[in-house]
Structures are given as C-alpha cells and as structure tokens.
Amino acid sequence: MSRILIVNSIYYTEIANLLLEGAIDKLKGSNASYDVVEVPGTFEIPATILFAVKSGHTNYDGYLALGCVIRGETDHYQYVCKGVIEGLNEVVMHYAIPLGMGVITADSKDKALVRADKNKKNVGGHAASTVLRMIDLHNKLK
C-alpha cells in the first residue's frame, strides 16, 4: 500500500476544498493511504514537502501538491507561480520523489473553480492519478 502526503494550500478555501475532494476521490479508488496537511498559501507547498522528506519521521511514497494562484493586478502572481514550480521541481529532482502537481494557475477565480471541480476539469483528481503512476514507475525503476 502506498502512503501519500497531500499538501493543500487553503488560501482560496473553496478551490482548496474542491481540489482535495477530487484528489481524495481518486485515491479512495486505489490501494493508497494518505495524510493531509494544510498550508496557508501555495508558496509554502515546496517547503512543506521538503520538511516531510528530510524529517525522517515519516515515510511517504509520494507527494501531492494542491493549490491555486490567481492572477491579480501586480507582478506577485508571476513570482509566486515561478517560486512554487521551481521549488517543487528542485525537491523532486534532488530527492527523486514521486509528485502529483495539482497547482492551478488561473486568470480568474471562475476559471480556477472550473479547473478544481471534480465534475469538470478535476485537477486534484488528475494530480492524484499522476502521483500514483509515478509511485508505480519509481518502484519499477528501483
């Protein structure tokens, strides 16, 4: 049985709940167990995964990053998006960990809601499927 850590950014609560719902629905249909930790914003996701990887207290087979960044009127959106993607990539490449990336970047809340809804784009569910496939691949290539 695979163990997965879901790191869920709760900055946009409604979107966070939809992402998590889609991910959990997908994981319940698999042979995986999961823990969920909430972080204040999407920017904190890479550090939280790194904390778990380096802690030695937990033994997760894969990680699921869920969050949302919505474009505003300043450059903040670009910096957060870049920081999150680069941070996740760095952790994945350095520690060779399976990851499902369910971080939505959208121009509006309405577009983000469509992507998060499990009955529409289901980004959370797709990210969960990805981490499960990456865990299988990781195990095959060990």
From Swiss-Prot:
The catalytic site is made up of H76
| Gene Ontology CC, one term | riboflavin synthase complex
Give me any GO biological process, just one. Answer: riboflavin biosynthetic process
Enzyme nomenclature, EC number? 2.5.1.78
Recorded superkingdom: Bacteria
Binding-site list for (2S)-2-hydroxy-3-oxobutyl phosphate: E73, T74, R115
Q: Which Gene3D superfamilies does this one have? A: Lumazine/riboflavin synthase
Where 5-amino-6-(D-ribitylamino)uracil binds, per the record, is at Y11, T42, F43, E44, C68, V69, I70, M101
Annotated InterPro entries: LS, LS/RS, LS/RS_sf
EC class of the enzyme, as a word:
transferase
Q: Which UniProt keywords apply?
A: Riboflavin biosynthesis, Transferase
Give the UniProt family note: Belongs to the DMRL synthase family.
PANTHER family (UniProt xref) = 6,7-DIMETHYL-8-RIBITYLLUMAZINE SYNTHASE, 6,7-DIMETHYL-8-RIBITYLLUMAZINE SYNTHASE DMRL SYNTHASE LUMAZINE SYNTHASE
Its protein name is 6,7-dimethyl-8-ribityllumazine synthase
Organism encoding this protein: Wolbachia sp. subsp. Drosophila simulans (strain wRi)
